[in-house]
Amino acid sequence: MNKVLYTFAFCLLSLTAFAQERFTSNQPFHSEMLGMDLPYAVVLPADYDETSETRYPVIYLTHGIGCTPDDWNDKYIRFEETLIQLEQEGLGDFIYVFPTGFSSYYSNTYDGKFPYMDMFIQEFIPFIDGKYRTIADRDHRATIGFSMGGFGAMVLPLKHPETFCFSAPLSMSFRTDEMYLEEPLKW
């Protein structure tokens, strides 16, 4: 019995370690529009390195206020565990991208000084499409987000339906114009 439990524990730990290796944090991206570096995280499909021609759909996972891209893996949903389940069900063949959102609500600021949404659409997505083997069209691009990121997951496709085919806002945070103006800008 102990032998079976040890074998099971070893297999489970091996799978988790394998998925964690694929969750690559602090990838470099420099935005000319924002004049700053915005690190992101990425998870590639298990067979990504086995073939040089296969292209994959992309899911952008947008985090909540006060969080970072790594919080998808460390704090909230334990992404590596979710990925293992998705792959066991045959549903893991996506490129998952976790952008840095600061406290932007994935929108442009009212005064135009921090055009986050414009940067996301005009710089970040083309950067990802150029760096990775994505299927670079709207039918293969989606957003999922929680809290502030849920707002981003909703507003990005609403304002840019030519770019995204699917949106899953989770526990979405809403802000009125007045609330948005009162919040301190942090980036």
List each model region and its residues.
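Hydrophobic h-region of N-terminal signal peptides that target proteins for export
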Residues: 10-19
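Sec-dependent signal peptide recognition
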Residues: 2-10
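Non-catalytic cap/lid and distal C-terminal segments of serine-dependent acyl enzymes
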Residues: 20-187
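Basic/polar N-terminal segments that are highly enriched at the extreme N-terminus
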Residues: 1, 18-21
